[in-house]
Amino acid sequence: MLAFFNEAAMLNHLYRFMTLCETNGGFAYEPLKPVAFFPGTFDPFSAGHKRIVEEIVLRGFEVYLAVDEFSWSKRTLAKLLRRQIVSMSAASLPDVYLFPDEIPVNLAVPDDLKTLAGLFCDRELYIVAGSDVILNASAYRQSGPGTAATCNHILLSRVDAAHAGDPRRAEDILKGKVVSLSLPAYYESASSTQIRDYIDKDMDIGMLVDPVVQD
């Protein structure tokens, strides 16, 4: 009997709500935000990474963070551990989400980029990449429709000491819209390489990562 009255009360409130929506208008939804996609990172999620995400959110973007499986060129942590670090570091940030593992995205494969764009129909999609990556990654040496260089980008200005004399500019390679972003020198120095070195030497990494993932 109690369940009957509970259901009746619920239906009564639901009916009133639907009536109010019909008479006063429905919900007013805000326009969908543009999407910023972080391609897979092989590194521990540093304080610099988090600061970049915070700045992008402040500029009105919805951020998706992907975690790649493996890199031959870097000494990586286990994928699930890196994914957990990213999740814990970004948990306090609004409009920041982990990108699903089930949808691999390779910037060098136009079909993957097409699939990515199709996930966010009617929304502007931006890829987040550092200027050093754009100048040196093989994905940006390709030309033609649908390649990485034709996508919109949030460009992170970085000084690459190994290519300091390179006259090329990342902006000249990119064909889509470009939103430029730079970090204070302190956050640039909080690199994943430094984090790994500190861990190997049993040194405190509290200033290099979010405090919630330090242990």
Residue ranges and their predicted role:
Residues M1-D215:
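Nucleotidyltransferase catalytic core that binds NTPs
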